[in-house]
Amino acid sequence: MGKPIVAIVGRPNVGKSTLFNKLAGKRISIVEDTPGVTRDRVYAQAEWLNYNFTIIDTGGIEPENNDVIISKMRRQAQVAIETANVIIFIVDGREGLTAADKEVAQMLRKSKKPIVLVVNKIDNMKQENYIYEFYNLGIGEPISISASQGLGLGDMLDKLVENFKNEGNEDEDSEYIKIAFIGKPNVGKSSLINKLLGEERVIVSDIPGTTRDAIDSYLETDEGKFLLIDTAGVRRKSKVKEEIEKYSVIRTYTAVERADVCILMLDATHDISEQDEKIIGYAHELNKAIMVVINKWDLVDKDTKTVNKYKTSIGSSLSFMSYAPYLFISAKTGQRVNRIFKMVRECYDNYCKQIKTGILNDIIGKIVMMKEPPVVGNKRLKIYYVTQIGTKPPTFVFFVNDSKCIHFSYRRYIENQLRDSFDFTGTGIKLEFRERKE
């Protein structure tokens, strides 16, 4: 499989957020001011025994009365079942076994997903006896922890990564370019996938957030082999708006995590929204190849300036990813749909692009000659050598005299010049500056 996804499920106040933050190694409710990235993060990267994995917080909105706890837990468990490779089911050792715990355990058992049962708030040896009643859940041996004190987390993580070893891998999918179709409900993601597949494979409805499971579809074309990932719709019966949005974000994030290329779908009949910016912000932050598809183009009154007006309007909202190409389509009529795989292929090839070191240094030499670095703190930046150290996205290391001398405007100048010299349409590029050891 790719990077494993771990979902944390549990009743309100059992310690989900405490465990989430402890595994992430920091408090992450407020994140860095990266353009286009939501501040209400529901995911984080973690590592144990050389296993890198993603943890998902399914906490949602905590209900204020007991009447809605069980229905909320059902939704929470369903999201975990849909999106995660392994589930951490956390219960409260002090409070003991509850009806909500039993019902969710039954759902999790039926899913056949690997489950790690964690009994939290066991702060000392005297409280170890609290864990035994949780054997009745029938989902394996409970592991006692204290998330707040960090006790027992090593044993829990050992058990967790054992499940990674047992999980199947996605080697059979490695020859496929994975495409995630992301966007708000009802922008036409499922309609487009059906048009590309030539069959009614994904449930399509005019109701935003129509209930459906995430579906992977395999397709071979002249442009290559593709795996299409549709982001599952949110549960339309939920009455809690914030909870709907959070679960939708979780589903979208897991699709983005798996993808090579993300297609942000927008509705031509609506302005770009903050939710659109958040959705594509995930893909940008995770360094995925990105393209923007504007659907329902057949419903727009057009003249010769309409396309440029749309590009300008969208570009002002998505300025942090100006590298993404645009395609105006109609999934309903099929207008320009046949161009999608060609554009995906171009974005993916640029995402994997490797520049020879000699050519790269020749270009950088010319870039510096055209515009000398500014003086920063009485010192001028000197670039000794450049090499590419990675792809997906292309990543370049500059060996310099003093990494503190790189001004943000000159960094941007270098990136723009590299883009002018090499085609990086559809992909971000990363520039790192390291001081050369004498």
Curated annotation (Swiss-Prot):
Superkingdom of origin organism: Bacteria
InterPro entries registered for this protein in UniProt: G_ENGA, GTP-bd, GTPase_Der, KH_dom-like, KH_dom-like_a/b, P-loop_NTPase, Small_GTP-bd
GO biological process, one term: ribosome biogenesis
Keyword terms: GTP-binding, Nucleotide-binding, Repeat, Ribosome biogenesis
Molecular function GO labels: GTP binding; ribosome binding
Residues involved in GTP 2 binding: 183-190, 230-234, 295-298
Chain ranges of the KH-like domain: 353-437
UniProt cross-references to CDD domains, sorted A to Z: EngA1 (cd01894), EngA2 (cd01895)
One Pfam assignment: MMR_HSR1
Family matches, as PROSITE patterns: G_ENGA
EngA-type G domain: residues covered: 4-168, 177-352
Binding residues for GTP 1: 10-17, 57-61, 120-123
UniProt cross-references to PANTHER family, sorted A to Z: GTPASE DER
Family annotation (NCBIfam families): GTPase_EngA (TIGR03594), small_GTP (TIGR00231)
Similarity-based family: Belongs to the TRAFAC class TrmE-Era-EngA-EngB-Septin-like GTPase superfamily. EngA (Der) GTPase family.
Self-association and partners: Associates with the 50S ribosomal subunit.
Function recorded in the entry: GTPase that plays an essential role in the late steps of ribosome biogenesis.
Protein name: GTPase Der
Gene this chain is encoded by: der
